[in-house]
Swiss-Prot record:
Classification of source organism: Eukaryota, Metazoa, Chordata, Craniata, Vertebrata
Pfam families: zf-C2H2, zf-Di19
Result of changing P649A: In FECD6; no effect on protein expression; no effect on nuclear localization
Family matches, as Gene3D superfamilies: Classic Zinc Finger (3.30.160.60), Homeodomain-like (1.10.10.60)
Keyword field contains Nucleus: yes
Entry protein name: Zinc finger E-box-binding homeobox 1
Length: 1124
């Protein structure tokens, strides 16, 4: 019967227990809590045993007992004091385990039996305590009051209460940590808060530790979780810590690469897929894996079945967001690009081209594939009028049309601005942006079909990457209106030709920025010119049809067009010049001059055989070419243009010689010429694609084996000189590539067809290094020297060309022919097409160099007009090329530009180096070039020492050896890693092995021999075996010395006992025996050395030798004993 009530009483006691706890709290609040905590510590003996119990009454008792002196007056009578004394004695008898059991019984409802068993020992006291506990319930304090003093453990108790609630009773006065048992609290205070000289205390939380390692481990608890993990892993060996996330690294360069994760910098870009990387390791692995190599056209021929991705084509107004592929960076001078592409746009740039509706001028209908398969690769061209911002882009590889895409001319503008580092083109673009925008608005308002009539199929190649890593853009443009395009066999519609006058006046509708004054300037400027090829040429434009330059006796060349006139639409020029009379097989004079000057730049003094080849390539008589070279050598024709540069980028300063040409025309033209310079960039009608800019920008283009490099001098006019002669601008600004009259007829053919189909001209046998040399105008010629010598050093792979028909009439079309054996754009030049190469990556390399380019001294005319000799091949040439690409106005002799403090700065990123060689090696990171190739496995490396270490894999050489474990390494890196991480481990291993060997080693030679024989096969390395044999030899020598001493002692004894004759016999016998022993030892040593190479044979030999030595020693000892 007692069990039931006991259980019920116990049940009811649980909530009261919380109240009791609160009661204690209330009482303690009346006194100083610190004093009470100290009192806990002071009364150790009386409180410890009572506090050890976790039961309800037991845990309450210690607190009441300690607080008793302060509240004895509040209690009624001394009965509780007496009971407490008795209860204390009972608890002492029980011990902590029984008390714990009792506590568990009081908490749980279903353990009444155990409660009853405990009750047998303490029934009276428990009942008395329960009565006292009932009286304590009268205090109404909330349970939360006491929880404030406990630890979070108490927060988990349920309504009925759990043992965790008792931890609130015993709280550490130093750190507020709660304990269920007072002994635990004492130990906690003793080991964590008592300070002495031997302890190590935490400066943050006053914890003390007996060992420093404990303190260090504890200090990690004050750090963030990431720091804790890092410290435990690294063992405090990582000195370089990231300030952003706290991650630490052993090496500084690892930290530098890690910081790029926070900054978002990704300096490494794949030339193939344009993917960017922040770590050089991931970039190198990406390059070596060649995952994106399949996306790259081979030899300029796109692979079939390529996925096509869409290239965004926003309207002209949205030019900043166009995803062109140039590598953009701010130059050291921090010249801001007008419209920089964001990093994200560069990253997400599409690799391939997607089929998109082809927008062609209304007058052109390419509904059927061209004869030569030009359009076979892509769908039929649709003659639809396009919005102003859209320009058709047709990939024109050597074989056929690949995916046509839409390109915004603003993209081209961005490309040119990036490629052209000169201030002039940038200023021109900035100054005329508003004008162009207004013009573009007009064109948008104009009838699309009419605009189509003025547009010409323009070709612009997207950034192209050849097999050799060359990245480029080829712009081949013509100013011819579609109306003048002839019907070519390729099913192109021929538009009705327009009269010359109408072309001049009407050809520039609303969208054209060229003013009517250009006609005047044209008329004024066409008077004086001198032919570069011959001395006497007709001075009249009408004589152009008669100008074929196959006869030296022909009259003087017709006067060149003024720059402004050259910028005018090609139709007017062609109409005026009667270009239509020229046969398609006759290359324009300007193109011929470009070729000749390119040859001259390659070799100023060609041999007769070379001259004949040049004459064949340019379709000119040998004597004409020879005479031209003589004039160039004599200085009559200057490669460099001495014309003054125009102060304003927009204006075209015509030489003073052209007094006929009104300067007002220039004043009126600034916008026009500027537009012309810009026009390719900005969909403006003006035809001028600044080759000069491109050539200037073709700093990016390099004389290295990269494809067409139109490096032109500053004063070089961008527009190529044609027979009709375009006015050359003496300006520093980008070259005006407006097509002169003579090209009009061939321009009538679609640019694509004229380039591909009209490749009537002989294929160039060798790529021309058409470095744009500055041209000095003849006293009568304003234009002749304007043509840039295109620096054409084609790579092994031919460029892919993209034809872009423009809605606006004047956008120069760009098409380049990519024959494997010919210079890609020379055919376009010969076909009256202006060709521009805008290298997107300044650092382009080709694996093969054509014979013409192989001539070591290559004089390249820098955009600033300075000539410099440099090797066409070798890594130095690469660095020169790279610097040339980036030479803004500095002399080219500084191959790599120095900053103000004499450092070498990378032009593709912001890194600066002290040595030019360091910069050159750094450039490999951008280009992906690995110049050091293994001759055995063809693996290439950026650094020579990497190749040296790689060669050791083939040779088996391992020059690095651990002095502890004897392991050898071929690479210094693996050796360093072993020494840093395993050195101590392998040291212990060696010591253990030595100790075991010493234990196994016996005092006799035989045992040593066997030990050596057993150890040798177990050794994985020859060095380990050598160390073992040395130790064995030392042991054997000691034993031999001991044996010799024993033998000497025996001999002395025998000498005392035996006669002299016997002594002599014994001496002879001993000598013989010693010789045998020595021979055996020598044989043993030889066997040991052989055993190092062949373990099995060494073991057998060692055992046999050991037997021999043992037998000989036994014989000697037996004979000596017998004699004794």
């Amino acid at each position: 019967m007692a069990d039931g009530p006991r259980c019920k009483r116990r049940k009811q006691a649980n909530p009261r227990r919380n109240n009791v706890t609160n009661y204690n709290t209330v009482v303690e609040t009346n006194s100083d809590s610190d004093d009470e905590d100290k009192l806990h510590i002071v009364e150790e003996e009386s409180v410890t045993d009572a506090a050890d119990c976790e039961g309800v009454p037991e845990d309450d008792l210690p607190t009441d007992q300690t607080v008793l002196p302060g509240r004895s007056s509040e209690r009624e009578g001394n009965a509780k004091n007496c009971w407490e004394d008795d209860r204390k004695e009972g608890q002492e008898i029980l011990g902590p385990e029984a008390q714990a059991d009792e506590a568990g019984c009081t908490v749980k409802d279903d353990e009444c039996e155990s409660d009853a068993e405990n009750e047998q020992n303490h029934d009276p006291n428990v009942e008395e305590f329960l009565q006292q506990q009932d009286t304590a319930v009268i205090f109404p304090e909330a349970p939360e009051e006491d929880q404030r003093q406990g630890t979070p453990e108490a927060s988990g108790h349920d309504e009925n209460g759990t043992p965790d609630a008792f931890s609130q009773l015993l709280t550490c006065p130093y750190c507020d940590r709660g304990y269920k048992r007072f002994t635990s609290l004492k130990e906690h205070i003793k080991y964590r808060h008592e300070k002495n000289e031997d302890n190590f205390s935490c400066s943050l939380c006053s914890y003390t530790f007996a060992y420093r390692t404990q303190l260090e481990r504890h200090m990690t608890s004050h750090k963030s979780g990431r720091d804790q993990r890092h410290v435990t892993q690294s063992g405090c060996n990582r000195k370089f810590k990231c300030t952003e996330c706290g991650k630490a690294f052993k090496y500084k360069h690892h930290l530098k690469e890690h910081l790029r994760i926070h900054s978002g910098e990704k300096p490494y870009e794949c030339p193939n897929c344009k993917k960017r990387f922040s770590h050089s390791g991931s970039y190198s692995s990406h390059i070596s894996s060649k995952k994106c190599i399949s996306l790259i056209p081979v030899n300029g021929r796109p692979r079939t079945g390529l996925k096509t991705s869409q290239c965004s084509s926003p309207s002209l107004s949205a030019s900043p967001g166009s995803p062109t592929r140039p590598q953009i960076r701010q130059k050291i001078e921090n010249k801001p690009l007008q419209e920089q592409l964001s990093v994200n746009q560069i990253k997400t740039e599409p690799v391939d081209y997607e089929f998109k509706p082809i927008v062609v001028a209304s007058g052109i209908n390419c509904s059927t594939p061209l004869q030569n398969g030009v359009f076979t690769g892509g769908g039929p061209l649709q003659a639809t009028s396009s919005p102003q911002g859209m320009v058709q882009a047709v990939v024109l590889p050597t074989v056929g049309l690949v995916s046509p895409i839409s390109i915004n001319l603003s993209d081209i503008q961005n490309v040119l601005k990036v490629a052209v580092d000169g201030n002039v083109i940038r200023q021109v673009l900035e100054n005329n942006q508003a004008n162009l925008a207004s013009k573009e608005q007009e064109t948008i308002n104009a009838s699309p079909i009419q605009q189509g009539g003025h547009s010409v199929i323009s070709a612009i190649s997207l950034p192209l990457v050849d097999q050799d890593g060359t990245t480029k853009i080829i712009i081949n443009y013509s100013l011819e209106q579609p109306s003048q395009l002839q019907v070519v066999p390729q099913n192109l519609k021929k538009e009705n030709p327009v009269a010359t006058n109408s072309c001049k006046s009407e050809k520039l509708p609303e969208d054209l920025t060229v003013k009517s004054e250009k006609d005047k300037s044209f008329e004024g400027g066409v008077n004086d010119s001198t032919c570069l090829l011959c001395d006497d040429c007709p001075g009249d434009i009408n004589a152009l049809p008669e100008l074929k330059h196959y006869d030296l006796k022909q009259p003087t060349q017709p006067p060149p067009l003024p720059a402004a006139e050259a910028e005018k639409p090609e139709s007017s020029v062609s109409s005026a010049t009667g270009d239509g009379n020229l046969s398609p097989s006759q290359p324009p004079l300007k193109n011929l001059l470009s070729l000749l000057k390119a040859y001259y730049a390659l070799n100023a003094q060609p041999s007769a055989e070379e001259l004949s080849k040049i004459a064949d390539s340019v379709n000119l008589p040998l004597d004409v070419v020879k005479k031209w070279f003589e004039k160039m050598q004599a200085g009559q024709i200057s490669v460099q243009s001495s014309e003054p540069s125009s102060p304003e980028p927009g204006k075209v300063n015509i030489p003073a010689k052209n007094n006929d040409q009104p300067q007002s025309a220039n004043a009126n033209e600034p916008q026009d010429s500027t537009v012309n310079l810009q026009s390719p960039l900005k969909m403006t009608n003006s035809p001028v694609l600044p080759v000069g800019s491109t050539t200037n920008g073709s700093r990016s283009s390099t004389p290295s084996p990269s494809p067409l490099n139109l490096s032109s001098s500053r004063n070089t006019q961008g527009y190529l000189y044609t027979a009709e002669g375009a006015q050359e601008e003496p300006q520093v600004e980008p070259l005006d590539l407006s097509l002169p009259k003579q090209q009009g007829e061939l321009l009538e053919r679609s640019t694509i067809t004229s380039v591909y189909q009209n490749s009537v001209y002989s294929v160039q046998e060798e790529p021309l290094n058409l470095s744009c040399a500055k041209k000095e105008p003849q006293k009568d010629s304003c234009v002749t020297d304007s043509e840039p010598v295109v620096n054409v050093i084609p790579p092994s792979a031919n460029p892919i060309n993209i034809a872009i028909p423009t809605v606006t009439a004047q956008l120069p079309t760009i098409v380049a022919i990519a024959d494997q054996n010919s210079v890609p754009c020379l055919r376009a030049l010969a076909a009256n097409k202006q060709t521009i190469l805008i290298p997107q990556v300044a650092y382009t390399y080709s694996t093969t160099v054509s014979p013409a380019v192989q001539e070591p001294p290559l004089k390249v005319i820098q955009p600033n007009g300075n000539q410099d000799e440099r090797q066409d091949t070798s890594s130095e040439g690469v660095s020169n090329v790279e610097d040339q690409n980036d030479s803004d106005s500095t002399p080219p002799k500084k191959k790599m530009r120095k900053t103000e403090n004499g450092m070498y700065a990378c032009d593709l990123c912001d890194k600066i180096f002290q040595k030019s060689s360091s910069l050159l090696r750094h450039k490999y990171e951008h280009t992906g070039k690995r110049p050091h190739e293994c001759g055995i496995c063809k693996k290439a490396f950026k650094h020579k020492h990497h190749l040296i270490e790689h060669m050791r894999l083939h040779s088996g050489e391992k020059p690095y050896q651990c002095d502890k474990c004897g392991k050898r390494f071929s690479h210094s890196g693996s050796y360093s890693q072993h020494m840093n991480h395993r050195y101590s481990y392998c040291k212990r291993e060696a010591e253990e092995r030595d100790s075991t060997e010493q234990e196994e080693a016996g005092p006799e030679i035989l045992s040593n021999e066997h030990v050596g024989a057993r150890a040798s096969p177990s050794q994985g390395d020859s060095d380990e075996r050598e160390s073992l044999t040395r130790e064995e030899d030392e042991d054997s020598e000691k034993e031999e010395e001991e044996e010799d001493k024993e033998m000497e002692e025996l001999q002395e004894e025998k000498e005392c006992e035996k006669p002299q004759g016997d002594e002599e016999e014994e001496e002879e016998e001993e000598e013989v025996e010693e010789e045998e022993v020595e021979e055996a030892e020598n044989e043993g040593e030889e066997a040991k050395t052989e055993g190092l190479m062949k373990d099995d044979r060494a073991e057998s030999q060692a055992s046999s030798l050991g037997q021999k030595v043992g037998e000989s020693s036994e014989q000697v000892s037996e004979e000596k004993t017998n004699e004794a």
